[in-house]
Amino acid sequence: RRCYDQIYMSAAYAGLPVHVLGSDAGVTAAFNGGTHMPLEDAAMYLSIPETVVLDPADYAQLECITRQLPGITSGVTYTRFVRKGIVKVYEDGSEFPIGKGVVLHESDKDVATIITSGIMVDESLKAYEALQAEGISVRVIDMFTWKPLDEELVIKAAKETGAIVTAENHNVTCGLGSVVSNCLAKNCPTVQEFVGVQDLFGQVGPQDFLMDEYGLRAANIVAAVKKAISRK
């Protein structure tokens, strides 16, 4: 927060290729407490013109992203990530072009789409399994690039499944859900539900406690999917 003016004026406005990495994103700040819990970090960077905002799910994705950063020769990039307790989602050496979402599950029977990123990818995959067990087929997309958004993939999912649920380790105001909602409003108005921190300040506590407290669990995603489907 304190360096925002420098990032905006000295880097972004000047058109310099500055790559910012922010660790302990969202509730993973845990015992750092409310004053040091970045629930709005991506929102600040999303609002700066010509930025790239990234939220990788695991080390393999982070490594691939990092290798691509030198190729971005103007403007600010912001990568938010986690330092500890990361669940492995992808195989080492996997490729993830910046600006393209990753479809993790897809079928012609999908009745909703979960769009997620970061630590919420693991929770979304758990939600997928729970919904499958109930006979509810959903699409799951890892949208690790928040900006520029893969609008083509979002629109395709919206048209084919008719309901969208976004799941993020961030405030739902001005985060991934808002970016997706803007895309849908412009191109393909679609029912959407938002899983994330609901306009609240951070607090101190273990990550597991915080994920329960802020509704960032697979069960919350399952409930949001069912609500979205009921609104179609």
Report each predicted region and the residues it spans.
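Conserved thiamine diphosphate
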Residues: R1-T113, I229
